[in-house]
Swiss-Prot record:
Residues that coordinate or bind acetyl-CoA: A375, A418, R435
Residues at the active site: H358 (proton acceptor)
Name assigned to this protein: Bifunctional protein GlmU
Region (Linker) location: 226-246
GO molecular function, one term: glucosamine-1-phosphate N-acetyltransferase activity
Gene for this chain: glmU
EC number: 2.7.7.23, 2.3.1.157
UniProt cross-references to InterPro entries, sorted A to Z: Bifunctional_GlmU, GlmU-like, GlmU_C_LbH, Hexapep, MobA-like_NTP_Trfase, Nucleotide-diphossugar_trans, Trimer_LpxA-like_sf
Function: Catalyzes the last two sequential reactions in the de novo biosynthetic pathway for UDP-N-acetylglucosamine (UDP-GlcNAc). The C-terminal domain catalyzes the transfer of acetyl group from acetyl coenzyme A to glucosamine-1-phosphate (GlcN-1-P) to produce N-acetylglucosamine-1-phosphate (GlcNAc-1-P), which is converted into UDP-GlcNAc by the transfer of uridine 5-monophosphate (from uridine 5-triphosphate), a reaction catalyzed by the N-terminal domain.
Source organism superkingdom: Bacteria
Annotated binding of Mg(2+), by residue: D103, N223
Species, as recorded: Prochlorococcus marinus (strain MIT 9215)
Lineage: Bacteria, Bacillati, Cyanobacteriota, Cyanophyceae, Synechococcales
Amino acid sequence: MLSVAILAAGKGTRMESSLPKVLHKISGKSLLQRVIDSCVELKPDQIFVITGHKSKEVEKAIPNDKKFHVVVQEPQSGTGHAIQVLCREVKKHQGKLLVLNGDVPLIRPSTLKRLLNLHDSKNADVSLITTKKTHPHGYGRVFLKGDFIERIVEEKDCNDLERENELINAGVYCFNWGILSEIINTLQSNNNQKEIYLTDTISLLKNSLSLEVEDNGELQGINNRIQLSECEEIIQNSIKEKHMLNGVTFINKASCSISEEAEIGKDVIIEANTHIRGNAKINSHCIIGPNTFIENSNVGLNCEISNSTVYASQIMDYIKIGPYSHIRPNSEISSFSKIGNFVEIKNSQLEEESKVNHLSYIGDSIIGRSTNIGAGTITANFDGQKKHQTKIGKNSSIGANTVFVAPINLGESVTTGAGSVITKDSKDNSLAISRTEQVNIENWERKKS
């Protein structure tokens, strides 16, 4: 039987944040979620998340699954105290207990599996991950005696000689839970921090093993915003390298960010300052950017999107968007259409070969095939209480500076006069015009101030 305990009770004081440390995000996922994802790969029987500081907030981030259990640690008196609380809450201490911190977002499932395999093969009381750091400031030092761990000394309790040891504790343990439960309550807070250390169990257990991991990048804990940024960079580099090996070009990859869920096709060019978030999909032969943000949207083949934002929308094939366009949620832009500069589209459908080239707002609308929307067109869709729809049939020509006061339904091949305010429906092949006749007053003199 395998149980997992994720330590997520700390305040994270050095983050200088009102948000619990484990809820800070890297590439769209919280630190806690990344640790959970790695643990789930092990197929454990149960996962305990030990919370404390702002427990209710942290609890909301835990999956709603019967495998997950919340254990509240009050007060937060150290890692050893956290496991003491867990052992009191859980009556059956069977099999293995994997313990790790909730702030190690880069830990690989494969490394955790290696630890479990070592533990099983040697029938250990405890096995833990260690690594060597050239400048190990802040980490507990691990001291070996032959093949076994003799003791672990926390940084603040080290003397000068002990601080020279470069073998550090990564904070990932696999215990024989039954044996651990017999000694856990003997731990005391006899140290400079006045906390109960889980590392003190090592000297009480006979068969304590070390799994030394060479790549200590994955063991990076997050204690401040600098380390958060470093981990973000590691993950982003990994994501972008994967896409580049699959045929994607980044013009300036350091200035771009890509979510792990995003899909990008071959021969896509990602220009500088482009950010692709959530479940976005960019199909082949597109040019995206520069200065473009796409989230939870599908972009078809051979599209060009520059200096624009696209949220939760469908962009079909051979479409040009931008510069400075804003495609808001629930919009669908059909193939061979064009959205030009300073255009906002919201909850609207544009059929094939439609054009909205300049300075327009299209909201809650259906625009027919091969329709041209003139500069400055506005769909006035909100009456102060609810939104209304505008429908414009195919092959229509909308004059510059037209305002549609929705609800409006225009037929096919309708033309509107420039500057019109359209308040009534129009039939097929009609001209809709609504403006006062121009009056010229000759010999007019402006009043002088």
